[in-house]
């Protein structure tokens, strides 16, 4: 258990994209990775993100919206920013923490199909990472 790696998904509000990424991460990576998400701010989990994940039988009602925790950030093996704002303003990561940017559109305030599209794109990206390490 202790030799699990840590992956940290970050976006602006820890409301939609990073919440969905955390859920997909737990599904696809949970046996090898500790999966966390956070935001530059904490806007609360978007009800449509909960609904979108329910459609694929993943329950995120118990996930919380959190601001970036320096302890997790500094010990993460991989930090993934999901929006350009988070990529630009994310606190600097130590040199030994690998950081990548996987950009996704923000579905907040958009029509329902956007939540479904972004949910599926994030799921596919994390599934690919679980299979290829990239």
From Swiss-Prot:
Keywords: Arsenical resistance, Cytoplasm, Disulfide bond, Oxidoreductase, Redox-active center. Catalyzes the reduction of arsenate [As(V)] to arsenite [As(III)]. Its main location: cytoplasm. Disulfide bonds join 11-83, 83-90. It comes from the Bacteria. It comes from Bacillus cereus (strain Q1). It is found in: Cytoplasm. The active site is at residues 11, 83, 90. One of its GO terms (molecular function) is arsenate reductase (thioredoxin) activity. The lineage of its organism: Bacteria, Bacillati, Bacillota, Bacilli, Bacillales. InterPro entries: Arsenate_reductase_ArsC, Ptyr_pPase, Ptyr_pPase_sf. This is Arsenate reductase. Coiled coil: none annotated. GO terms for biological process: response to arsenic-containing substance. Signal peptide: none annotated. Belongs to the low molecular weight phosphotyrosine protein phosphatase family. Thioredoxin-coupled ArsC subfamily. It catalyses: arsenate + [thioredoxin]-dithiol + H(+) = arsenite + [thioredoxin]-disulfide + H2O. It is an enzyme of class 1 (oxidoreductase). Its EC number is 1.20.4.4. One of its GO terms (cellular component) is cytoplasm. HAMAP family: Arsenate_reduct.
């Amino acid at each position: 258990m202790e030799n699990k790696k840590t992956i940290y998904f970050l976006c602006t509000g820890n409301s939609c994209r990073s919440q969905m990424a955390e859920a997909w991460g737990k599904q696809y990576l949970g046996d090898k990775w500790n999966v966390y998400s956070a935001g530059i701010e904490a806007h609360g989990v978007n009800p449509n993100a909960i609904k979108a994940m329910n459609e694929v039988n993943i329950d995120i009602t118990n996930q919380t919206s959190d601001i970036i925790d320096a302890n997790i950030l500094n010990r993460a093996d991989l930090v993934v920013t999901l929006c350009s704002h988070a990529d630009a303003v994310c606190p600097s990561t130590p040199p030994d923490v690998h950081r990548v940017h996987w950009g996704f559109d923000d579905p907040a305030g958009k029509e329902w199909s956007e939540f479904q599209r972004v949910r599926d794109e994030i799921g596919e990206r994390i599934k690919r990472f679980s299979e290829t390490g990239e």
